Amino acid sequence: MGRTPLTLLKSPLLPSLSMSTTTPTWSTVPAGALPRLTVDGQETGLALWTARTRRERNIGLLGTDSIDGALWITRCNWVHCFRMRHTIDVVYVGRRGKVVAVTTMAPNRMGMPRLLATAVVEMRQGDASRLGIRRGSILAAAPTVPLSRPDPASAGAQNTMLGSTH
């Protein structure tokens, strides 16, 4: 009647340790339906997940082997990579989407809080450099192009400046 070590590690807040994925484990939205990250007004093609709830922010990219896109974490000015499986680029974003700092974090490391940051964007290692993201860049979300005409009742419901405060 002894417990196996794996049953002790299960938690409703943490993803399965054996799961192999390149999307946030808490999201059910397919990458094709997500907005795209823009840098200085230019669309990058990167799918953009947004972690808005406490649960989503706490889990972040835990349980992933990489990410096919980027994760925008709202109401956040620091992150850690404890229990992460891969190195990531971390972009600290301030008001109106302005980049405050960019760094790369290896697994089991803790980032420094950035007092001017209101959000953090996590992406695959090397993506920030490849996309030209640097201090002073402006990040935003470009809405996906609908395959059919949008419902007028829901038009304009998407905020394209995620996590910003005006």
Give the ranges of each region predicted by the language model:
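Compact, glycine-rich, soluble single-domain proteins
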Residues: 2-166
